[in-house]
Amino acid sequence: MKRITVTKFGLLSGGLMFAGGLIFAGGTQDDNPPRVAQVVALDECDPVTFNAALGPDFCKNVTIGAFTKLTDLFAKAQAGTPDPGWDFEPDTLHIQKGTDLVVVDQGGEPHTFTEVAQFGGGFLPVLNAPGEETIPECAGGFSNVAVARTRILQGSQDHITGLSKGEHLFQCCIHPWMRVKVEVK
């Protein structure tokens, strides 16, 4: 009985040493761990005016002492000078093929992160620059499932994987001046 236990212990120890050797030799480690790049959605919505017009808790202001009233946001967009407090950061991103994008909404209201063929107007004409039409990828707003899938809510994130080599353009279909160009090498 004692001999069987010693034999089993020896086999177990040998197996563990072999497995440990594989790990240190890289036999079970991923030689190319996934790469991640982050894009952050920002805004400065004023909870009082946004929530009065759009419903309770639509805007959860996250800025300290800086906010934009809903009417001011509309006026700036209509004048062709959209509010710079609504932004994707960075504006341009250079990544390697296989890199995952993590898009985080650190603003106070929802956004979309929609891939588009070319930049243009979103689905809310009041927020489009003068003469700017809604682009096909944003048409229909959230009733279009393709647009709804790209929505990111306050405090949430989305993961974009499998981008091919080349240039990829993303914009918010609500606030169309929020734009990012991603170059995949």
Explain the meaning of each model-derived region:
Residues 10-21:
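Bacterial N-terminal signal peptides
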